Every structure is written in C-alpha cells, then in structure tokens.
C-alpha cells in the first residue's frame, strides 16, 4: 500500500479522484454505510462510484508511469506484430482444412497415383527388376555384416521396397539393408548380448527396428525433421567413411578364409590381425579375390566404354548394374560343382541352409528389459537412419529436379521399419548404390518398389536351394566392392579443406575416431563437433563498420550507367588498396551484423561496438569525475595537461549509430538489453543523447521488440512533425520507362499546400526529352502530373529506415545540417508529388 501511495502521489493529480465521487468523502460514506445497513441499494450505488473512481485513478496513474518511463502501449506494439495475429495466421486459420491437408499429406500416393501414365509402367518394371537383381545378393551380404542369418537381409529388403512406395515423396530412393546400419546393428547385438545372453540376435535386431522406427516416425509426424539440418555434410561424410573402412577391414578375413582367427573390434586392430594371419589364407581367397577383381574391372570398363561409345551406353549400364548378380550366380555354380559331393564337409565356406519363404512372420518378442538394454543404443541408430535416408533422398531430388518432403520421408522410413518387425526384419534405410541404379534405370514413380519386392519374394520361394552353395568369400567381395563407394574420394576431401578448413577437421577427426575407437564414438564426436562449431559461429559473429563507395555499371570502355551509393565494410580497403571508401559523417557509425543478434553473441557484439566507437570519438567532457575519489576503480587516472600544451583531441563527438539489420533474423531479450546498455554507456561517454537508428529490419517481431525497449524514435521527445519519411511515388496507372525514371532524380523545391506549411509534394526537373510516357498523364490544360505518396516506414518510428542510405541522409539533414531541416517540411499521408514539365 505504501508503494501504491508513492506511485499515486508521484504520477497522479487531485483531479483523478474527483470522477464519480470525491476522494475525501469516501471515509464518511463508509461510516454512513456501516451505520445504515438497511439502505442496501444506496450502498451498492455509492460503492460502485467508489470502485469506478479507484479504477479511473489506477488507469490514469499507470498511463502516466508508462509515459514517464517511455513504455509503449500494447496497442502500439500490436500494430507491428501481435501474438493473436500470429496465432490466428499459423494455428486457428482454416484449422480443419489444414488438418485434412495434414492427413492427406501422410499418403502421397493419393496425389500421384490417379495421374499415373500407363507408358511409365515399362520404365518402372525395368527399374524394379534391375534393383531386385541387386538387392538379393546385397541383402544377404549385409545380413552377414549385421551378424544375422542371410534370410533376414531378404526379409528387410522385401518390406523396405514394398511399404515405402505408399508413403514416399522420392521416386528414386530404395529402402532396405545398408552397410552402415548393418554394422551398427551388429554392434548393438554384441553389446546387448554381453549384458544378457537370453536374447537371440534376430530378437535384438527386430526390437531395435521397432524402437528406432517409432522414434523416426514420431519425428516425422511432429514435423521435427529440421533437426537433421544441424549436422553438416563433412560430419556425415566423416562417420560414413569411418564406417566403410570398418566394414571393409572386417570383411577381409572372410574374403581370405580365416574369419574365425580375427577377434578384434577396433578397425586398426582388425587390419593388424588380418595382416598377421595372411599365412593362414585358404582356398576361399580364390573365390573372393577373383570376384573382387571382376567386380571392379567390370565397373570401370563399363564406365569407360559407356563414355567412349555413347550409342551403347544403355547396354553398358545394364551390364554394370548386374555385375554383382552375375558374379554371385557364376560363383555359386562353381561352388555347387565343388561341394555337391561334400555337403557335410564342404572344402570352402558356404552359406548353407536358407529357409524357404517367410518362416518367421508373426508378433516379435518384445520385453521391457530388452527395451531398457537397447535404450543407450538408440541415439546412434536413429542418427544413422535419419542422415543416410534424408541425404540420399535430397541428393537424388536435386539431381532429378523434384522436391522431397523430409518429414514425410521420415514417416515413410519409420512406418517401413514398424511394419517390418512382423516379418522379423532388422532396421532398414535408404541405400545410395541401389538408389543410383534405380535412377539410372529410368524409374518414373515409386511403384517400381512393388516389382523389386516381387523379385525378392521369387528368390525366397524359388531360389533358396541354390542359396545353399553361395560362397561366403563372394558375399564378402560384394560387400567390400559396395562399401568402397562410401569412402570419400580424395578430390572431395581436398575440396572440404579449401572451402572450410574447420569443417574439414571435423571430417578427419570423425574418421580417426571411427578407426581407432568405434563407429558409435565416431558418430557422437562428429555430431558434437558440428554442434560446437555452430555455437562458436553464433557466439562469435562477424560484424563490420561500413563506409560508402560509389558503384556503377560499365558497358564497354566509356558507357557508365546506374551510378549509386552502396555501403561496404571499411576493411575491404585492405583487400583492395585502390578502393576509395568514404567514412560516414563525423560522429556517425554504421554497423552491420552478419548473424542473428541473440544471447550467445550479445556480449561480444556490444564490446566490439563500444571499443571501436570509443577509439574513434572523444569524450563529451574531458574529466567527468571532478574528484579523483569519485573515479571508478576500472577507469584509469587522467593525466593533467600542461598549461602550454597545444595538443587538441580532434576526434569527433559521438552523435548516432546506424545498425544494418539486413542479416538479423532474430533478436532476443539479452540482445535488446545489451543495446540498452550500450546506449547508456555511450551517452555517459559522449555526455549527450546518442541516436540509435535501424535499417533493413526484416521482421515485424524485431520491430516490436525494439519499440518495446524504447528504440525507434527520439528518446524523451515526441516525434517531430517534420520528420523525414521514406516514400515511394509511382505514377497513377502508368509504368515509367527507365529514361523517365532517371529524369525524376532532382528535387527543385517542395510544394506547400496547407496553412501549416506541410509539404504534399515536390516539383521535379525534366529535361524535356523522352518523356512521352509522362506527358500522357498530364491533366488537360495543365503541365503537371500528380504522383501519390506511399510510405515505406511508419511516421511513428522515424529511426527505422528502409536502407542505410536513407538513414545517413536523415542524420545529415537533422543532426549535421540542422539549418536545412526546414526545407524538408513534412510529408502528409496520402499526399501527392507534382511534376512540372520544363520544355526546351
């Protein structure tokens, strides 16, 4: 109550208490009401008068408090941007229609299937069968990487291609087993079985598919796919390359025939042990090395011949695509000839029994304990699923000129893995190699996945007897050949270094950690380093003080046109010494921030501005502290000048700062507080009011934030009626030619048309040439054309400008040349500009 009394006495007048009832009468009235309880109606009426008076008093007092501290009214802020408007625009506007659109977007097949062209069917059929011939040997090979029986790779292959087409926004992506995810699955199986050996490898892999698929689907449904963008390309390339090296080294023992003798886990140890056991090489190496040579030879020869003989390019492409299937078929035939009489003890390592059909269809075994054991393994699994699929989908969408919907792609991948658990499939994601084959085969729509699924089913029901004799060494050769495409080429590595050395370091560190520690650590390190680099860039933004140069377009040797003023960083002169950069007017500074102005960088930016300005301006008072005892501890003692000293500080006094917000997309509370602190600090330093001007503001919310903090207009004063306002003045119902637009460049004099001397327009000088498009708009019997004013910025906030040039002109006019300010007059809203024709 004491606080309210102080506020009332400071900001209220006695007239505030005379509305409805006199303030001094209230105690008597309350005594009267206490003694006369019978007259209840009179009590109610007088009490209402009392409350009305109190409400009026409170409201007026609050208004005076806001005026005293220059706090804008809520209505004034809502004109710039308001929460109800945003909520109405983004949430409540057509909410039912948006909900239906959301449900429809979950099934993109509804959009493109009715428009399916029958002529596309042959392309989809060829692409589907081609991918099917590749996915069968790859699926069985990747199941080996995941330490699962071969049939589980086929189960994942079938579900991936069959389900994805109903939810896909990419026609090229092929979902199924991939090398990196298979390796992660193997790591997860090993870690969980080390905790509890009661679970089998397929049970663990299926539960992992359930949890990872549910998380991925949830991210897509909630439209949170943008979080993937926080991981840059070098980080993805780093752990992908590390994973490829891990897979490649892990398949060498099986390729050479001494798989059981290499037990190391880290990549570098696997390489060392593989080299130590080279004397233990068996006959399997003949199958593996020959197959590997044929695969690489066929690949490079088909690529070379396809370029050399473009006429036969399609035939070479088909040969190159089917090379893995042909190698597996030929190798299996040779293996059958060798092992058919030695089924119980084959001389080479073969796959042996592969169950026919879908032997494990049903509800999987999922327990709480298994889910708890898998919890720590989920982050890395989800990251790999997300990054591999989205990066592949985006790259093929960019190459083939269509756009994907990342969130819908996550839903498609999540649903595919969720349905796959009923077939005992392990986690699947987009495959780069199979997607590339699918795209080159001329696929037209996602329906090609149905034909790929048919090939997988055919192999499961008709070819399982033949799968018995597939040599493991050949499957290892197929894996090694496939993962070499995941290793980043040297050319791309050098490009990373040339573009961004810091991001290239992330790539190298990720590869090193993956090789010498583990794939999981490599992924975590790359993601953490990418996040640290992002925060570092936000916390240490690049800011520049600007100067002016005159730019023009030069045509030929003599023709120069479109001369204009542009503002560039002052440090550009160091890069180009011949460039003449004109500094802003004395006491005026122009600062451009190249990042959003938020709490991580607020302190650094304010320090940068304060130091630069204090270095280039002088204090308003030489010694603001009369006595040394009043000097703060952090302010150095000023030396007394000698009496005969003629040294004078010629630096200007600080007058204004112009902030170029063209690159600022966000402005938070901490940043605004730093602006307030800078203004306070610099006003103490300059011993006068320092104007803060803002240009190129991109968002109404940024304007609202600045206005709420007291920026946008002169501090402590009402807005002058003669303030300069940027306007656009188009011809009514006409399009000016470029020549006539240039003829409107010089203002001769303002036109005053009211008693207060306000300006409603200006007379422009014309050269009398090429003005036919102006003359046709002259009124009959007159030589004048009226042009309407359209204001760019609000008259309420004269310190908000459309660009830097207009802010500088305004400051030159009002601060540096105050005697000229009357010539500008004021601009009436809805006024007109008059153009006077001057004949030759």
Swiss-Prot record:
GO terms for biological process: chloride transmembrane transport; sulfate import across plasma membrane; sulfate transmembrane transport. It is a multi-pass membrane protein. One of its GO terms (cellular component) is plasma membrane. InterPro entries: SLC26A/SulP_dom (IPR011547), SLC26A/SulP_fam (IPR001902), STAS_dom (IPR002645), STAS_dom_sf (IPR036513). It is found in: Membrane. Residues 578-733 form the STAS domain. GO terms for molecular function: sulfate transmembrane transporter activity. Keywords: Membrane, Phosphoprotein, Transmembrane, Transmembrane helix, Transport. The modification Phosphoserine is found at residue 823. The keyword Phosphoprotein applies. The chain crosses the membrane at residues 120-140, 148-168, 173-193, 208-228, 230-250, 278-298, 315-335, 410-430, 447-467, 470-490, 505-525, 527-547. Belongs to the SLC26A/SulP transporter (TC 2.A.53) family. NCBIfam families: sulP (TIGR00815). High affinity uptake of sulfate into the cell. This is Probable sulfate permease C869.05c.
